[in-house]
Design a protein with these regions (language model features):
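Kelch-like beta-propeller repeat domains
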Residues: 1-89
């Protein structure tokens, strides 16, 4: 199971978390184990209310609302093999 974004300590997040059903543990992907917001053109911005789909060893993330509650219309791909984000234009 994967979760992206949401609220952390009252602020919107751009963390991607994976839950392992076998070990019943969470892992933050692409950032190590820190909970902090990273702003970069190479990863999605902080958001809530986005949609996600897992397909062919990748996670696709679409839309949501950003830190200013503006609607987002962007599409991102997270490659599970390389732990890298790529924006899809």
């Amino acid at each position: 199971m994967f979760i992206f974004g949401g609220y952390v300590k009252g602020s919107k997040s751009n963390d991607l978390w994976k839950f392992d059903l076998n070990s019943m543990s969470w892992t933050c992907l692409g950032q190590g184990d820190k909970i902090e917001t990273i702003t970069s053109p190479n990863r999605p911005c902080q958001r809530i209310g986005s949609a996600m789909l897992c397909f062919n060893n990748a996670i696709y993330l679409f839309g949501g609302h950003d830190a200013f509650n503006e609607k987002l219309n962007d599409l991102w791909k997270f490659d599970l093999a390389s732990n890298q984000w790529a924006k899809i234009d």
